[in-house]
Structures are given as C-alpha cells and as structure tokens.
Amino acid sequence: MAQTTKLTYQPNVLPADTLTGDKVVNHQKEDLGKIEHLMIDLANGRIAYAVLSFGGFLGMGDKLFAIPWSALKVDTVEKQFILNVDKEVLKSAPGFDKDHWPNMADLNWANGVFKFYNTKPYWD
C-alpha cells in the first residue's frame, strides 16, 4: 500500500506592526531604508504599498516612497525586505515627505508608481 503525505498550508500571517521598521536592501545588499508604514487597500483586503523611508540623517530629511507590496521580496533569514532597484535609481523615484502625502486613491498616481517599479498593478 502506497503511503501518501498530506501537504499542510501554513499561512504567513503577522501583525503589521512587526514589519514596520524592517530594513529594505537591494540585491547588492545596499541599505535602501526602512519600512515606516503599510498601506492597506480596504476594498480588496490586501497590502497595497509599503512606505519606505530613505535618505536623511537620524530621521531628519527622510524622503518617503510608496513601494508596491508586490515589488518587495521577503528575506526571512535576515528579517528584511529586498527591493530590486539601484540606490541611485531610488533617489529619482516618485516620493513625498511626511507632511505632504499623495492621494493614494488617484489611479494616475498609482499607475505611475507601479510602472516605476516595473510591477503590474494588482487591480488590473
């Protein structure tokens, strides 16, 4: 009699606040900043963006970037995220400061962000 192995799905579910503050690096292991916020699409029940804080010094002058969640890969060993973008390219990415957030419900803005990171919008 053949023995079968039952595969068990183990969801990767974590509290959102455990991800804020996590480091983001690129494939060259350059530090790109840290995750400040997770933006939730309430209508679709999913994370739309991770807000990345980059640049500045001791939290002053940081620029914020909305990174499509699908553009980030999890490195569970190092407890960090990997974003496939060169550090110099990130400097020219569409960003904002902590006092002037974009309208993330604006589809023109959102499409531009997903295009910049070469990621297909999840609503398409």
Identify the meaning behind each predicted range.
Residues 1-124:
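Peripheral interaction segments used for macromolecular assembly
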